[in-house]
Amino acid sequence: MFIILKRNILINMSFLLNLGELGTFFADEIENLENFTNWISSDFINFINAIVNDIKNIASFLGQAISDIPTFMVNIATNFLTILQNFVQTAISTIQGFVSWFEQQIVGAFEFLSSIASDFINSAYSFFQNVANVFAQIISGVISDFLNFFGANMKHISNAISQLSQFLSPFIAPITIGKFLPVIVDKLAEILPEIEIDLAPVGLGGKIPIKFGEIIKAFAETSVDFLNEIRTELATTLKEFIKEPFISDFKISAREIFNEIGLGDLPFADPPFQLIGRWVAVRSFDEVKDHLRETILLTGYPAWFTNAYLESPVNDFVPKNPLFRPVGIRDLITGSQYGILNISDLEKYAYNNLITPKTAKLMYQNQTARLLQRAVEQGIRQFVITPQKAYEEIISNINLTGKELFLKTFTLEYEYAVQRIVRQFLRSLLSRALSNFGKPYLDFKYLDNTIAKLFKDLGYPEEVRTVFDTMITQSQLIDTNQLLLRQLQQIVKLGIFNEKKIKEELKANKFNEQVALQILESELQFAQLQNTLKEYQFKLKSFLISPKDVEKDLKHLGFDSAIISALIYENQVEQLIKFQLTNIESLAKKGYLSLDEIKKQFKAIGIIKEYEDAFINFINQELQISAFLTILKSQLRQFQIDPKVAEAELKKLNINEYLSNQIIQEEYNINIAKLHLSVLETIAKTLYYDQQQLSGELEKIIKDKTALELYIKKFYYEYIYPKIVNYHVQLARHGILSDISKLPKEVIDYEIKPALLTYQTTLEIEYIKESLKDLEIKPTDAINELEKLGMQKDIAQLIVNTYIPTFYNVHTIIQNIIEGQLYKVGKVPINLGNAESELRKLGIPDSQIKILLDQYSTTFGLDIWRKHLPSISIIENAIKYNYLDQKLIEYSFIPSELLNLYINYYQHLLVGQEVQSFKSEYITALIYNYQNLQLENLLKQYGINEALLSVIKLFAQVRKIVLGLQELYLTPTKALSISEYVSNPQQLLQKVFTEFQIPQELQNTYFEYARNRRVSRYVNEIITTINLLFEKHKIDLGTAQSYLQQLKKYGLTDEEIQLIILNWQLRSAY
């Protein structure tokens, strides 16, 4: 900046006359510096934060400090300008000739001294920087040794000490330089010389001293303070950073020791009361009260303070325990408004919210006033209530509470709502009245009275009524004149035009006579010409007039030639051509005209060749299709062609699907249906069809309902009816009497009723058998019932003896006796109570009751005994935990030989499971070349033989190779990344893509991507250079744009070029 300032002084010394403008001199440099520092304060800070969270404080401080660099540089410029301005103002006030003398005499000396000072400062700073770097290396070594020795015994951070030392080393040199910098500046200021400017040559007398040291200090003061702040903050943060891992390691180790010796609740730090509150909120206060007491006592706070946190809360709005949330003033106000609380409670509890009763009352009145305000505002907006009345309603009711308050509020809202609805109806009537004004069928006097009444009911201001009356007047005038003009136009269209009468009418209704009369005259002329055209159109269509006569007459009337030609063509020529074409088409379709004759007649009419060719092609197709269809129909009628083949032939000719279906239906389907019906009658005589099948088959053939019904009845009575009778007989044999009313009486008496009686008798006998089994009937009663059915007595007695049940189970009794001896079951105390009498009530024979009771009691006792015998899982747990009691073994009923064998097996199994669990871990160890012979011997001992162990080792070797290939083998993605750093990327990518069989099109895409990615940095630098050249006006926009176009082959798109150019244009306007 000193060199730039010197150059500007040499170019134009006139700036000394207006030194205040020098403040803009640094604008460009400061702007560039701001852009740089903005990047530093955003992207660079984000980068620092992403690298390591431990220096967050440093990064934050650096970001804030660096962001102040623009202000710092402006301060430097301002200080320099202040010194220079004071000096110049002193000299310029004496004589203007000083400028010329200063330019000739001093500039050279200033340049010389500045050059010497600059070289000296740079050399001095380099010397001090080297000294600082030496000290930094020494300090870095000391810190590294200290950390390594001190952290060797820290088990949690010992492995990270070397990384910690490497992380701290880069920060030592900046801190050392920052420490030396203030001394460097002071020493430089003392060393730099002081010169004097003698003013005698210009006749002023005296000397002006210039102290370079002071100038250096003026420039360096801000930067030294700034760097001191950075150094201090950096050193403080690094000290905390170094200290924190050791403190944390010590706390973790101490915490583990305290937990192991039972002092886990002894805290190292007291939690804040906010955290205590959240902790208590998710737990029960009574549950954690004792622990809370110990924690609070650790704080050392006085008893009046801590006792409040330990006191049980009061079930009131003021709980007297700070951990419990008291009621808020707004909740109290709301409760008072709803009547839940009295207004006196509000004043009482307001004091607890540090609010005086008077203030609380004011807050209540304010909130009540807002509630009432919302209600009365509805009335004001609808002109239902005046502002004065609305204000009085609010003020007079602000002290109401509870029911009185809300009854008042709801009453106001209800009244306003009712009046609002009424006014909506009135406004609707008023709007309709406004839209209907001006209609000649209305009684204006009656309507005016109605409007006046509506305005009175609505209470609108007089100004609204005035505007409304004006709109009514204008509406009347416009509607009346529109109706009148429309009627005059309708009359004129009929050819009636009385000019005098029309003028009088227009004048009487305040029309613009000239314009209105011109409109009506135009309407008359249009009607006359339209009627003339209709006459000529009729004559042309009827061939009553020649085109020449029409053309002559219409030209005389002033019609344009184009309109005349269109009229003649549309109404005569077109009709004549259509008539001729219709006759030619009719004769050609019948084959009465040859192709040459058709062409001759088309040529005479003037038909174009395209239509002629299309017409002849159409006629040929029609004649061909017509002949083909005649032959095809005959073949279908005679069944000489399959309908599918016929359908295919029709499709070849592009015959419409509906027409094809019609031909096949009429010529084939109807005839084949007749033949099918004949065949069906023959089949029905020998094969069985039910009614539904018969109906279905007949419906396929017969579409007439009468014929269909006759055929169905015929087949029904011949084949289906006998089956129906058999069906009802089968149902009766199973006790089902369906609807047989339609069957003849003979069939019912001799076939259905006997079958039903047989079923009923069989069912009653089965019922008696089941009743005997369930003891629901006595044996004597069962015999009597069987005899009533007509059964002989000896057979009835046999049935009864057979079906009386035996309730006890001999096999179960025998099993209970044997198992009782085996399990050594003692007597199980069972109280049978009145079970014997209850069984007797059920009808169980006395001979079975005692046996039955003994059977169930012994079974019950054995079930209890079995349920509690030691199972195999209990024996396994006993082996696992070395508790094999003799009684446990005895009651398990496992033979001793088997038990000893199982104990040995299970113990071996437990050890083997643990040994084999090392298998996957040992494979991982083998991958990293670690072999343990002791573990291999154990594996061999517990199920892993030599062959399987060899397989495990082979698996580890293969896994190691796969792991290496996964890390180092070139996949397409890795090849794309590595291609940026190899000498022949194209060859590398080609080899990898070929190996993975990547499609050629995709290969070309990624070749281009790899190339553009490799050169993208240089492309960005070129774009930046083009940007700088354009901003410095070294190249014009066209040249810059041509350079950008050359970069399109490296991936730059037209959209990106347009955005870059737009950015240049925006920056040029900045």
From Swiss-Prot:
Resulting phenotype, S396G: In strain: Isolate variant XX
Mutation: I1061L; reported impact is: In strain: Isolate variant XX
Q: What is this protein called?
A: Uncharacterized protein 1070
What happens after mutating K552N? In strain: Isolate variant XX
Q: What happens when you mutate V911I?
A: In strain: Isolate variant XX
Substitution effect: I106V? In strain: Isolate variant XX
Domain UBA positions = 477-523
Q: What is the effect of changing K493R?
A: In strain: Isolate variant XX
Describe the effect of S837P. Answer: In strain: Isolate variant XX
Q: What is the effect of changing K439R?
A: In strain: Isolate variant XX
Q: Mutating V725I leads to what result?
A: In strain: Isolate variant XX
Q: Which InterPro entries match?
A: UBA (IPR015940)
Impact noted for substituting T582S: In strain: Isolate variant XX
Q: What would changing T924N do, according to UniProt? A: In strain: Isolate variant XX
UniProt superkingdom: Viruses
